[in-house]
Regions:
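Mature extracellular/passenger domains of Gram-negative fimbrial/pilin and adhesin proteins
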Residues: 2-5, 21-193
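Bacterial N-terminal signal peptides
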Residues: 9-18
Length: 193
């Protein structure tokens, strides 16, 4: 009988030890892992070209005041999107760069104002940018109310014809146009779809 009691105590002690282990495991905190991502289309390389040469500036050279007033001074150039990976389309938006503004009263116009700091600075002169090789045809890329210009990418590249046209500032009169340096900086925002 003593052997049975001793065996019972050993089994009971082991059961308590085992229950104690399970209790410890039951109080261990668990961690959840949540992975969140947004799978997006690839992007493209972008560059501006004028006459098949890569440029960073669209240089009008010398322009005469009557050309500005008449709006007859324009330059064509291209935005090239290349090496596009899984990108069927994009939207271009043109916005004034830091330190640049829109033309018109209080900067409310749709052309890009002269932001030159040179002396003398051309007064009452602005530049329009158009989504075609010919100004005043196609879609104007507006300054104040920046609009999205859709581009379809076929294959891995696309050439987007654009043009810039010097004009009289929409908030000024012809007599306000003066000679001097002109510079207007803008930034293309490209959203891939």
């Amino acid at each position: 009988m003593k052997k049975t009691t001793l065996a019972c105590y050993i089994v009971s002690a082991m059961a308590c030890f085992s229950i104690g282990m399970n209790t410890a495991n039951a109080t261990t905190d668990s961690l959840d892992l949540t992975v969140v991502t947004k799978v997006t289309a690839g992007t493209c390389s972008a560059e501006l070209q004028e006459n098949s040469k890569t440029v960073t500036d669209i240089d009008f050279q010398d322009v005469f005041i009557p050309e500005v007033i008449s709006g007859n001074k324009a330059k064509s150039f291209n935005l090239i999107l290349s090496n596009c990976a899984a990108t069927p389309s994009a939207e271009l938006t043109l916005k004034p760069a830091s330190g640049s503004t829109c033309d018109g009263a209080a900067g409310a116009g749709e052309a890009f104002a002269n932001s030159s700091v040179a002396t003398p600075k051309a007064a009452a002169v602005a530049v329009e940018v158009w989504g075609s090789a010919t100004p005043k045809s196609g879609t104007q890329l507006k300054c104040k109310s920046a609009n999205a210009f859709p581009v379809t990418i076929v294959g891995k590249s696309v050439t987007v014809p654009l043009s810039a046209r010097l004009i009289r500032d929409s908030g000024k009169a012809d007599a306000d146009v003066t000679a001097g340096e002109f510079s207007s900086q803008a930034v293309f925002d490209i959203t891939y779809k």
